[in-house]
């Protein structure tokens, strides 16, 4: 299914980032996608399932979390971090920060998957070390 991707900070992602990006707390806060209940039903997923999010820039496997705040149908939210970085526009405009927002029509494909979820270390190895070997 096609969804509009929104990204940004969350309280939990920020707190976990300060505690340490290699901790399970950070993985649980940033390696997720928030989806509203109606869209979860359409995708045939429940909280804790894995989905693959694909864009023209890349793809990533994340865990599903039910959106607890109002989110329109057709929109998903991935907290800012390495998992979101896999699918957002990589141009940093010399800031060192990817373009998480500010470009119209950013749609991604989302599908349920049994593929492996990559923790922080494995994700970095795949994206930045193995990619150049």
Swiss-Prot record:
One of its GO terms (molecular function) is oxidoreductase activity. CDD domains: MopB_CT_FmdC-FwdD. It holds the Pfam family Molydop_binding. InterPro entries: Archaeal_lipid_biosynth_FwdD, Asp_de-COase-like_dom_sf, FmdC/FwdD_MopB-bd, Formylmethanofuran_DH_dsu, MoPterin_dinucl-bd_dom, Prok_molybdopt-oxidoreductase. It comes from the Archaea. PANTHER family: RESPIRATORY NITRATE REDUCTASE (PTHR43105), RESPIRATORY NITRATE REDUCTASE 2 ALPHA CHAIN (PTHR43105:SF2). This is Protein FwdD. It comes from Methanocaldococcus jannaschii (strain ATCC 43067 / DSM 2661 / JAL-1 / JCM 10045 / NBRC 100440).
């Amino acid at each position: 299914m096609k969804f509009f991707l929104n990204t940004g900070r969350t309280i939990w992602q920020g707190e976990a980032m300060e505690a340490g990006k290699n901790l399970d707390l950070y993985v649980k806060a940033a390696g997720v996608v928030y989806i509203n209940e109606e869209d979860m039903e359409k995708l045939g997923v429940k909280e804790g399932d894995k989905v693959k999010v694909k864009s023209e820039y890349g793809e990533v496997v994340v865990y599903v979390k039910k959106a607890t705040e109002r989110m329109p149908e057709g929109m998903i939210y991935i907290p800012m971090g390495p998992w979101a970085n896999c699918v957002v526009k990589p141009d940093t405009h010399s800031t060192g920060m990817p373009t998480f927002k500010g470009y119209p029509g950013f749609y991604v494909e989302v599908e349920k998957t049994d593929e492996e979820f990559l923790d922080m270390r494995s994700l970095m190895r795949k994206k930045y070390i193995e990619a150049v070997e």
